[in-house]
């Protein structure tokens, strides 16, 4: 099943699987997959190109993967529409289309996929790695209704929840091309903040208070003993 999925995705991306290795161990109770991708690119985006004043955008809505995992753990009662929403989330976890499109634009200075630790963790990682900071705005964060409901009912912060499927992109200057490229793909593209010249990532909350953001464990670790 794992390799069937890998082969299907490789064909979709027009890439070749050239080798592999499998083994069994009593120490490992679940399948673990790791991979290495090798290829050529015309332009390399580096975190060191990030500069104060760059604006931060995210694609799609946040915590897509986290919502799917959380639903699998807590088994909430879902309407048929919510079940279809989960299926749509699950099929939207790749960022290949938007990352390829954005990487071609001179206005995009850096990108970082939003995985463990959510969007706050991703912003902290990319900024701290180059000695910069950021202002992030809670009111601008794109969180789907189902995600918000499941997170609220289970004491989870969606901004710190694994968000595979979202790409964090820094845009310098005119954002017209970037917005047009994402619109052409049918991908939401939301501005959530800007890079600053200090070393603090600040979340400006909807109630007017602020919070200094650090790289912390993902919210799913709250359920580490329940995910079987």
Language model region names:
Residues 2, 6, 123, 147, ...:
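Aromatic/hydrophobic pocket-lining residues that form π-stacking "cages" and hydrophobic walls in ligand
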Residues 87-163:
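Active-site-proximal betaalpha loop/short-helix elements
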Residues 183-228:
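Acidic, Ser/Thr/Pro-rich beta/coil linker or hinge segments at domain junctions
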Residues 34-45, 81-103:
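Active-site glycine-rich loop that binds ribose-phosphate moieties when present
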């Amino acid at each position: 099943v794992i390799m069937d999925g890998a082969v299907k995705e490789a064909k979709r991306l027009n890439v070749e699987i050239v080798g592999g290795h499998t083994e069994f161990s009593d120490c490992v109770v679940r399948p673990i997959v790791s991979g290495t991708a090798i290829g050529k690119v015309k332009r390399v985006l580096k975190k060191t190109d990030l500069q104060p004043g760059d604006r931060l955008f995210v694609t799609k809505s946040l915590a897509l993967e986290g919502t799917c995992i959380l639903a699998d753990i807590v088994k909430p009662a879902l309407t048929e529409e919510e079940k279809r929403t989960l299926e749509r989330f699950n099929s939207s976890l790749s960022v290949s289309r938007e990352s390829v499109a954005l990487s071609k634009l001179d206005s995009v200075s850096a990108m970082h996929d939003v995985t463990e630790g959510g969007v706050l963790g991703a912003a902290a990682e990319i900024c701290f790695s180059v000695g910069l900071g950021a202002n992030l705005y809670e009111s601008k964060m794109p969180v789907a209704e189902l995600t918000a409901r499941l997170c609220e009912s289970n004491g989870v912060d969606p901004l710190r929840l694994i968000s595979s499927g979202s790409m964090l992109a820094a845009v310098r200057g005119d954002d017209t091309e970037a917005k047009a490229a994402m619109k052409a793909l049918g991908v939401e593209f939301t501005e959530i903040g800007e890079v600053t010249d200090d070393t603090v990532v600040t979340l400006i909350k909807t109630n007017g208070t602020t919070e200094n953001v650090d790289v912390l464990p993902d919210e799913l670790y709250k359920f580490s003993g329940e995910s079987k």
